[in-house]
Regions:
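A catalytic-pocket lid/entrance helix-loop region that shapes and gates access to the active site
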Residues: 106-112, 202, 208-217
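N-terminal cap/lid subdomain of alpha/beta-hydrolase-fold enzymes
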Residues: 61-163
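Glycine-rich nucleophile elbow surrounding the catalytic serine of serine-hydrolase chemistry
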Residues: 147, 196-209
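Bacterial Sec-dependent N-terminal signal peptides
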Residues: 1-23
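Phosphate/oxyanion-binding active-site loops and adjacent basic polyanion-contact surfaces
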Residues: 60-66, 162-175, 199-205
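Alpha/beta-hydrolase fold nucleophile elbow
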Residues: 186-199
Length: 217
C-alpha cells in the first residue's frame, strides 16, 4: 500500500511537472541591468551589465528567433560616441559566447590558475586584464546556444532551420541582429570590432563583410 501511494504521488508529480514544462514560454524581448565596480590595470571604475534577449525578425516583421546577450558598458565616459564597441562570439559553431565572456575579455572571469584549472573557492573574480577599461563589449549567443532559440510563429510553426544553420545563413541573420542591437543602443557612431574564437574567426570575417556591404556599417 505504501509503495502504491508513493507511485501515485510520483505519477501526479510527473503530470504536474510535464504540464508546467509545456506551458513555459521563451522570452522574446527582455532587458535587465545591474551596476558593478572593478579595477583594471590599477584603475577603478563602475560599469553596467545588461543581459537580455533580442529578436530576429522574419520577412513579415514577426520574431522567428530570440538571441540572448550580455552587454557591458563603462559608466561616466565623457566621449561615449567615440568609445569602441566589441562584438564577441565563440566558435563551434555550436558554442555560446561563455568562454570569451568568463575566461577572456569580460570584466568577471572564472577563478582559475595560470594553467586554466579551477581553484578554490570556486566561483568568479574580477578580471584584471578585461578590455572593459577601453571598450564596451557585447557577448552574443547564436541560435541554439546558451538561451538563444528559434520561436514559433502565430500558427505555432517553427521557422525553417536553413534560415539559421549554415555558413551563409549564420552570417545573414547575425548581421541583421547586430544592426538592430547597434540601433537600439545608439552605437552607430562608435568604432566597431568583431572578435571570435575558433569557428568564431570564420564567422566574424563573414560578418564584417556583410555588415559593410548590406548594412552600411
Amino acid at each position: 500500500m505504501t509503495s502504491m501511494k508513493y507511485l501515485c504521488s510520483l505519477l501526479l508529480f510527473l503530470v504536474i511537472y510535464t504540464s508546467n514544462s509545456q506551458s513555459r514560454t521563451i522570452p522574446v524581448d527582455t532587458l535587465v541591468k545591474t551596476t558593478h565596480n572593478t579595477t583594471v590595470k590599477g584603475q577603478s571604475f563602475s560599469y553596467t551589465a545588461e543581459t537580455g534577449t533580442q529578436p530576429v525578425w522574419d520577412k513579415n516583421g514577426d520574431p522567428m528567433a530570440t538571441l540572448f546577450y550580455t552587454y557591458y558598458t563603462r559608466n561616466n565616459v565623457k566621449d561615449s560616441a567615440n568609445r569602441p564597441l566589441i562584438i564577441s562570439f565563440n566558435g563551434g559553431p555550436g558554442s555560446a559566447s561563455v568562454w570569451m565572456h568568463v575566461a577572456y575579455t569580460g570584466p568577471r572571469i572564472l577563478n582559475i590558475d595560470e594553467e586554466g584549472y579551477p581553484v578554490q573557492p570556486y566561483g568568479f573574480r574580477n578580471n584584471p586584464n578585461s578590455i572593459i577599461d577601453v571598450a564596451d563589449i557585447v557577448f552574443v549567443n547564436p541560435v541554439n546556444t546558451g538561451y538563444s532559440r528559434m520561436i514559433p510563429d502565430k500558427e505555432n510553426k517553427m521557422p525553417e532551420k536553413e534560415l539559421f544553420f549554415g555558413i551563409n545563413a549564420d552570417i545573414k541573420y547575425l548581421t541583421e541582429w547586430v544592426n538592430t542591437f547597434v540601433s537600439r543602443h545608439n552605437r552607430w557612431e562608435s568604432p566597431k570590432y568583431i572578435i571570435g574564437e575558433s569557428y568564431g574567426g570564420t564567422r566574424v570575417m563573414g560578418l564584417a563583410n556583410e555588415l559593410q556591404s548590406s548594412q552600411w556599417m
